[in-house]
C-alpha cells in the first residue's frame, strides 16, 4: 500500500471554475435589466452635472472656487486654489476635472438621499440600528477600490461604477451621524416641539 498517494495523483478533474464562471455569467445576464434601472438615475444626474460644469466658463468657476476657498480657509488657501485651478487648465485637464467634480457631486447627492432616511430609521428603531451596525462596519472597513471589482462586474465599465463605489464607501458616516444627531436631541426639546404642535418628522428636520 502506497502511503504517499494523494488525491492530486489521480487524474480527476473537477470543473469548479467553469461552473462558477458559467453561473455568474448567467446570473449577470439575467439581472442586467435590473442594474440598468439602478444606474439610470445616477447616469442622468451625472451627465446633467457634467454638462452644466463644462458649459460654465472657466473664469466664472475660477471666481466661485477662489471665493469659496477664501471664505472657508482664508487668503492663503484662496491663492493656492487659484494657482491649482490655473495649472489644471494649462495642462489641459479642465474637462476631466469637471467630470471628477460631477462624480463627487452625484455621489454626495445620492449619499444624502439614501443615508439620511436610513439614519432617521436607525434613530427610531434600536432593532434596525443593531442590524445596520455590522453592515456599516464592513462597508467602512473594506477599502473603496475593492468595491470597484464587483461594481464594474455588475454595472459595466464607465463613470457609474466609480460613483457607486464612492456612494458605498461614503454612505456609513452619513447614516451614523444622522442617527447619532437625532438620538442626542434632549427629551426636553422634543417635548417642547410636541407642545408647539410639531410632528415627529418636523422635529427631526
Would you name each region that the model predicts?
Residues 2-57:
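Interfacial loop/helix-cap signal at membrane boundaries in integral membrane proteins
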Residues 33-47, 60-71, 123-132:
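Short juxtamembrane and helix-loop transition motifs at transmembrane-helix boundaries
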Residues 43-54, 94-106, 129-132, 136-140, ...:
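Alpha-helical membrane-interface segments at transmembrane helix boundaries
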Residues 58-64, 75-87:
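Hydrophobic mid-bilayer segments of alpha-helices in multi-pass membrane transport proteins
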Residues 65-70, 85-95, 107-136:
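Transmembrane-helix boundary motif in ABC transporter permease subunits
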Residues 103-106, 111-114, 123, 137-173:
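Generic hydrophobic transmembrane alpha-helix motif, especially the helices
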Residues 196-197:
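Glycine/proline-centered hinge or cleavage motifs at structural transition points of membrane proteins
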Residues 204-205:
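Conserved small/polar residues in nucleotide/adenosyl-binding loops
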Amino acid at each position: 500500500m502506497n502511503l504517499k498517494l494523494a488525491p492530486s495523483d489521480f487524474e480527476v478533474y473537477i470543473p469548479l471554475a467553469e461552473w462558477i464562471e458559467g453561473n455568474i455569467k448567467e446570473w449577470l445576464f439575467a439581472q442586467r435589466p435590473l442594474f440598468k434601472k439602478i444606474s439610470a438615475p445616477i447616469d442622468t444626474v451625472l451627465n446633467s452635472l457634467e454638462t452644466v460644469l463644462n458649459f460654465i466658463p472657466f473664469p466664472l468657476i475660477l471666481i466661485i472656487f477662489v471665493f469659496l476657498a477664501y471664505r472657508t480657509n482664508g487668503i492663503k488657501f484662496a491663492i493656492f486654489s487659484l494657482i491649482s485651478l490655473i495649472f489644471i487648465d494649462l495642462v489641459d485637464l479642465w474637462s476631466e476635472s469637471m467630470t471628477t467634480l460631477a462624480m463627487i457631486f452625484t455621489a454626495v447627492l445620492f449619499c444624502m438621499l439614501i443615508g439620511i432616511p436610513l439614519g432617521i430609521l436607525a434613530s427610531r428603531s434600536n432593532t434596525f440600528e443593531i442590524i445596520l451596525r455590522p453592515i456599516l462596519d464592513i462597508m467602512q472597513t473594506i477599502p473603496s477600490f475593492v468595491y470597484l471589482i464587483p461594481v464594474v462586474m455588475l454595472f459595466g465599465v464607465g463613470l457609474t461604477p466609480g460613483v457607486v463605489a464612492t456612494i458605498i464607501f461614503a454612505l456609513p458616516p452619513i447614516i451614523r451621524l444622522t442617527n447619532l444627531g437625532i438620538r442626542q436631541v434632549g427629551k426636553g426639546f422634543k417635548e417642547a416641539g410636541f407642545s408647539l404642535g410639531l410632528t415627529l418628522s418636523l422635529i427631526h428636520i
